[in-house]
């Protein structure tokens, strides 16, 4: 355990940030899973609606550094490709 006041504060901040980041990461995963679930059900309209919700979340969290920008780009690219494939079929 930290003895210095500033170290105690930093430890407390770390706990708070960890909880916040964990919750936000969970929200992100849930949003992406909703798109995938709609895609698996061949529901193009539902997938597009879910993707419209997931895309700004991916952008926002990559801008904040919660996930890497390339990971966000990869998710968006793959989901968009799957949505286009379902619409074309």
From Swiss-Prot:
Pfam families: Ribosomal_S20p. Transmembrane segments: none annotated. It comes from the Bacteria. GO terms for cellular component: cytosol; small ribosomal subunit. Disulfide bonds: none annotated. Residues 1-24 are annotated as: Disordered. GO terms for biological process: translation. GO terms for molecular function: small ribosomal subunit rRNA binding; structural constituent of ribosome. Keywords: Ribonucleoprotein, Ribosomal protein, RNA-binding, rRNA-binding. Residues 1-12 have a biased composition (Basic residues). The keyword Ribonucleoprotein applies. Binds directly to 16S ribosomal RNA. Belongs to the bacterial ribosomal protein bS20 family. This is Small ribosomal subunit protein bS20. It comes from Xanthomonas campestris pv. campestris (strain ATCC 33913 / DSM 3586 / NCPPB 528 / LMG 568 / P 25). The gene is rpsT.
């Amino acid at each position: 355990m930290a003895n210095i006041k500033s170290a105690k504060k930093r430890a407390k901040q770390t706990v708070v940030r960890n909880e916040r980041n964990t919750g936000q990461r969970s929200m992100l995963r849930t949003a992406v899973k909703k798109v995938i679930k709609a895609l698996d059900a061949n529901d193009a309209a539902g997938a597009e609606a879910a993707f419209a919700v997931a895309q700004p979340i991916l952008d926002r969290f990559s801008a904040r550094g919660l996930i890497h920008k390339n990971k966000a780009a990869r998710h968006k690219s793959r989901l968009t490709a799957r949505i286009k494939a379902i619409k074309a079929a």
